[in-house]
């Protein structure tokens, strides 16, 4: 067991949480709180602006479901992704969009990385800055994906750094994108983007 700082002010980070059975990381400062579902694609499930108590992320009516505990009842290729989609913000890689055949492997809606558990390591944990690295190796495709999330004191900004590496001996095409679903209460009749 490792020791983790438990501050009540400044920047804070903890990977000692689970939500609906999924390993969860909470990253925050005085202005924002970001909740990441490490065991489900390292999805950003919650992005809250604390001074106004506003969550920017849209959420499905059924909420968070653990893809490791779900057995699809159909062969519908879009099915598993939609069945466990909670809303929020996903990293799409190495494919995105509709199901496809990728070098002979069947890949479902929005790729495989969005439903896989990712590893996590806290890189920095100080009152001025917190940072966590998430990474995964995909099952059906030869890719290593890494993202680092950082929050600095005094900022209402989540810094995101991502990379994708083809670990195969031959070149491979890849799609790499962000699936960000904004919703109420942030999106309203008075919202301007």
Protein language model features and the residues they cover:
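Surface-exposed acidic/polar loop and edge beta-strand patches at domain peripheries
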Residues: 1-159, 170-173, 177-193
């Amino acid at each position: 067991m490792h020791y983790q700082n438990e501050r009540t002010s400044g920047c804070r980070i903890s990977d000692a949480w689970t939500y609906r059975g999924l390993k969860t990381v909470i990253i925050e400062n005085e202005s924002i709180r970001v909740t990441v579902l490490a065991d489900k694609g390292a999805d950003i499930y919650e992005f809250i602006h604390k001074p106004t108590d506003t969550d920017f992320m849209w959420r499905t009516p059924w909420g968070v479901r653990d893809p490791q505990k779900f057995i699809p009842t159909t062969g519908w290729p879009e099915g598993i992704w939609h069945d466990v989609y909670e809303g929020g913000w996903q990293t799409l890689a190495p494919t995105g969009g509709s199901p496809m055949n990728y070098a002979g492997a069947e890949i479902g809606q929005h790729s495989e990385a969005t439903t896989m558990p990712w590893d996590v390591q806290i890189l920095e944990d100080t009152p001025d800055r917190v940072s966590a690295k998430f990474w995964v190796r995909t099952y059906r495709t030869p890719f290593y994906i890494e993202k680092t999330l950082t929050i600095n004191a005094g900022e209402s900004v989540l810094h995101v750094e991502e990379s994708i590496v083809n670990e195969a001996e031959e070149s491979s095409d890849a799609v790499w994108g962000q699936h960000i679903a904004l919703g109420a209460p942030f999106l309203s009749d008075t919202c301007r983007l």
